[in-house]
From Swiss-Prot:
It comes from Dictyostelium discoideum (Social amoeba). Required for normal chemotaxis in response to cAMP and folate. Required for the heterodimerization of the G protein beta and gamma subunits gpbA and gpgA, which is itself thought to be necessary for prenylation of the gamma subunit gpgA and its association with plasma membranes. GO terms for cellular component: cytoplasm; cytosol. GO terms for biological process: chemotaxis to cAMP; chemotaxis to folate; heterotrimeric G-protein complex assembly; protein folding; protein localization to plasma membrane; regulation of G protein-coupled receptor signaling pathway. The lineage of its organism: Eukaryota, Amoebozoa, Evosea, Eumycetozoa, Dictyostelia. This is Phosducin-like protein 1.
Amino acid sequence: MEQNILNSILDKFGDGDQERSDIRHNDSGDENDNHSDHEGNHGNNECCEGNEDGDKEYEVDVEDMTDEQYAQFIQEQQEPKIKSGGNTGVKGVLSDYAEHREKQKQKYLQKKYETQKMLEKMCFTTRDQPPPTEEENQLDSDDDDLERIRKARMEQWKSKQQITSDVKKPEKKVFGYFKQIDSSQYIHEIDNEPPNVFVIIHLFQNYIPECVLLNQQLGQLAVKYRYIKFLKILSKEAKENYHDEALPSLLVYIGGKLLVSFVPLTEELGRNFDQEDLELLLSSYDIIPNPMKAKNSNWETSLSRKRPESDDDNDD
């Protein structure tokens, strides 16, 4: 009886030990298994973190993506933040992307507008080109048309100035300097002046003798005619593909618009021009007073002062 009871107890506890042994054999211990699982997960996390670092270092070209691809890309980049924080969703990402695209578009349009505005202000005649070919020489009639348009524009401007002066003569702004500018200042220097101010700009290169000569003369005119704004700019700075054959170029603006352009100036004055030649040319467009009239006026004034003395001598 006792043996039967003992065998029953051994069988009972033996099965239980085997089950626990099997559990420990399969699980290798609860604490160790949990620790192994934790290390495995930690290894996976490190791997993911490594991938994230790799993704950060790799620059993705988003310009070629569609809106949906870009939204998915942004969502993947922000996925850890979305899990831990608020979820912006695809609509939020698309909204941010649309705002980014709009800013880029506005920036591009602004740059395009400024470039176009500068080119409009530098609308030279057809002489701002390389030496003409035989076919181009047959287009002389076009130059005549341009000359007629230029004269008509001058007459229109003169009549407008006459009307303005009859109503009210605005105060003149004083300059008295000859300043060099760059392309970023070009439009600003022309537009930000009163409508009655002439702005004369010389496009030049230092290795061209006529440009050096003109710079010397313009520097003297800037002191003599202080109500005119005299500027100079390197031709390649103003226009990248500007031809040296068109130098020296002299442009005259008033009221923010191109009044007349001499491109090149040597076609009007030749290569051995002096300051008086330049003044006569500018005075022919009423930009400055005629220097010959001023000389004649001074001569007549001087002569009139001497006449009474000569008359008195004759009477004696």
